[in-house]
Amino acid sequence: MIHRPRYHDWSWPKGKAENGEPLVAAAVREVEEETGQVITLGAPLTTQRYRLGGGQTKEVHYWVGTPMPVGDPAVRLRAPVARAPRTEIDQTTWATPAAAADMLTRRGDRRLLADVVARAREGRLATSTIIVLRPGAADPAPIDAASAAPVGGRASAPGTSASGGTASGSAPTPGPGSVPGSSSVPTVPGGPGPLAAAPAAPTPRPAPTPAMVASAAARRAAQVERASSLTAEAAAHPADPPLGRFGVRQSFDLIDLLSAFGVGRAFTSPSARARQVLAPWAAVGGGSVTLVEALGVPVGDEAGADKDADARAGRVRAFAAQRLREQAGATLLSVTGAARDLIVEEIRAYGSSAIVGASPVSLGHGQIMVAHVEQGTDGPVVVAVETHSVTTKNPAVPTRRASRRH
């Protein structure tokens, strides 16, 4: 508990989130600033709401916290924290539940204490954490200018019309087979600018012979067959694109979220994005990452996977159930595709109807679902579910500027 000389009260440590700081990162930072204790977060407690003097409502989120040793990998990932000045916090102390109930000034803080004591007496205070992560998106595939030309057409060079004549200063109507967006005004290398020339006479073409017609038809048929085979191959072997540029930035900001919950190990599906999003966290913090083949479909084996869909779903659910039964602190699951939805569905099955209603059906890119699990006499029980997102700014997405009055 902390004592604030300005208000002459005893309360729980708390504070405001900085601009762009996730709430859970703010929670562990404020506790360290005000008490010197380095903690990781467990299950959430009741959110406190009360009115301020100006009529505004203040909302404060609380979690069960566990002190961590300074050398813990989850702690090493955090930025250094400076202690709060004595003018803000002049005393900190541990107290027994009975003494704390007498010392706490606010009634809401005493309710939080009663909640924690009740959970401890019922054996529900200690929980493990399962975190499901949806990795960031891949960058959109670049558009190849060559592939933009119609199949079988012959792309014209910039500055020439489809009939082979040189363009004048005014843009002619593009002929069939011309590249969309190509310039129709030629320039002279080293010259001052666009070349304005009189239209040249079109080059006479030889009359088509039966052999030429047959050759053109054969080329056209080969192009159509090649395009069809490429389309079928792309459908049968979906690409495994890497993490996009914005997703890479999200992977660095994800470190603060994972550190707040004390994640020390991770499991990942075989997809590139699921593995790459963990790279900064694993490299800096030294966390363990285990590749689980059962959480993905090997590229090139999609047809066989469709025939074995029920068996694959059963393996994914069994994997999730095994993680729920473990008392291993905080575990991260980085999964893409249908396997992630199956894991979320399995986690929801271990909670009450209220938990199911509060838990998300799907996750956004860079978002995590945090499930807090207690081990009951009849097996694991999900007692709380929360979602958090990285606050990475995407410069590629234009922001809406506030209008100014003149």
Task: Please report, for each region that a protein language model flagged, where it lies by residue.
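Active-site-adjacent beta-strand/loop module that shapes the phosphate/pyrophosphate-binding cleft
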Residues: 48-80, 93
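Active-site-proximal alpha-helix that buttresses catalytic centers in soluble enzyme cores
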Residues: 15, 26, 125-159, 164, ...
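A short coil-to-beta-strand element that immediately follows conserved catalytic motifs
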Residues: 38-48, 288-295
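NUDIX/MutT-family hydrolases
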Residues: 73-120
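Domain-level recognition of soluble alpha/beta enzyme cores
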Residues: 351-381
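N-terminal strand-loop-strand
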Residues: 1-12, 131, 135
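The catalytic Nudix box helix
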Residues: 12-45
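Generic beta-sheet signal
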Residues: 128-131, 329-338
